[in-house]
Amino acid sequence: MLFFKSIASLAALVSLAVASPIESRQSATTCGSTNYSASQVRAAANAACQYYQNDDTAGSSTYPHTYNNYEGFDFPVDGPYQEFPIKSGGVYTGGSPGADRVVINTNCEYAGAITHTGASGNNFVGCSGTN
């Protein structure tokens, strides 16, 4: 009897897991020597999404704008992609973008975080968690 209860419980858990979609979650990251909390990453990605969906940019900047992934990062979501600055002092609203970016796709799914810090020329390298 205990065996059948265990099997029934396991079946219930599996059905819950199958019914729950898996989404890409923004997590904390480090770009160069700058640490960003999960909430900072989420805020930047959400701002990028809002501007993108409203066909708008932050201040007089060009962000968000197309990110072509010339570096060949293996993002967990398909493109096309948009890049948007992430700043430690709050959400980017224009001006100097700094070196660090969040990347979203045009469905507003978080793809990763990248930085110019440590990259040659105008290229990017992945922040922690982005390969």
From Swiss-Prot:
Disulfide bonds join C31-C127, C49-C108. GO terms for molecular function: lyase activity; ribonuclease T1 activity; RNA binding; RNA endonuclease activity. The modification Pyrrolidone carboxylic acid is found at Q26. The keyword Ribosomal protein does not apply. It comes from the Eukaryota. The active site is at H65, E83, H116. Gene3D superfamilies: Microbial ribonucleases. It is an enzyme of class 4 (lyase). Its EC number is 4.6.1.24. Residues 1-25 form the signal peptide. Keywords: Disulfide bond, Endonuclease, Hydrolase, Lyase, Nuclease, Pyrrolidone carboxylic acid, Signal. It catalyses: [RNA] containing guanosine + H2O = an [RNA fragment]-3'-guanosine-3'-phosphate + a 5'-hydroxy-ribonucleotide-3'-[RNA fragment]. CDD domains: fungal_RNase. Pfam families: Ribonuclease. Belongs to the ribonuclease N1/T1 family. This is Guanyl-specific ribonuclease F1.
